[in-house]
Design a protein with these regions (language model features):
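Fe(II)/2-oxoglutarate
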Residues: 1-58
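Alpha-helical interaction segments
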Residues: 5, 102, 106, 136, ...
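Short, functionally important structural connectors and interaction interfaces within domains
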Residues: 17, 24, 57-58, 62, ...
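Short low-complexity stretches enriched in small and charged residues
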Residues: 19-21, 29, 93-98, 119-126, ...
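FAD-dinucleotide binding site
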Residues: 19-20, 47-48, 55, 64-65, ...
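Non-heme Fe(II)/2-oxoglutarate
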Residues: 37-133
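Catalytic core of non-heme Fe(II) oxygenases with the double-stranded beta-helix
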Residues: 124-189
Length: 189
């Protein structure tokens, strides 16, 4: 089991969340509570959290989730992590779709619990705001290493274990290539 080196990453709180987004989620909670209390029989009004999401392609949104400082700390922590835990491809996926990853539930339960906290308290309200569906049962939280030196490209796929996927680039602008391409829509870098 990997022990986190940076104490801040072990704190279950919202310090790492982009503050305007966090405030928008908090302001959205009464609206979401009314909507869910009425069992979704009435329309959910546009929440402040939904207003923070920018629709880039139909049904595909960008949200300013984490603070830059958190992303920097995570990248540093991943540097320590790979000294003890190598990135491994998922053997249950076919070769074209295998990206080296570290599954947090298996290797860093403490960090997994903190990401679970973020899913429940921040991401889930955003998903309810955008899609009027809850997404509390997360299938996996992993750190993927999209490295052009080791893998020139991935292949089209659907995440079999999820109806909704959340991709969080930690080092935006700190690499060449990369990004996430959405079939018949375009590439997000």
């Amino acid at each position: 089991m990997y022990a986190l080196k940076n104490y801040l990453l072990s704190m279950q709180s919202h310090w790492m969340i982009n503050q305007p987004l966090y405030e928008a989620v908090q302001q959205s909670m009464p609206m979401i509570a009314r909507y869910t209390g009425r069992e979704g029989l009435e329309r959910l009004e546009t929440t402040p959290a939904a207003k923070m999401a920018k629709e880039l392609f139909p049904g595909i949104y960008r949200v300013p989730l984490f603070r830059r400082q958190f992303c920097k700390l995570m990248i540093e922590e991943i540097g320590h992590m790979v000294e003890e835990i190598p990135f491994q491809p998922n053997d249950s996926e076919d070769t074209l779709r295998q990206i080296p990853e570290i599954v947090l539930r298996e290797h860093s339960p403490e960090l997994y619990r903190n990401m679970w906290f973020v899913v429940n308290t921040v991401i889930n309200p955003i998903i309810i705001s955008l899609f009027q569906r809850e997404c509390r049962d997360i299938a996996s939280v992993q750190i993927a290493n999209y490295n052009l030196a080791e893998k020139k490209q991935g292949a089209w796929h659907h995440d079999e274990s999820a109806d909704i996927s959340v991709v969080v680039p930690l080092n935006t602008g700190g690499y060449k290539g990369g990004g996430t391409e959405f079939h018949r829509h375009g590439v997000l870098k």
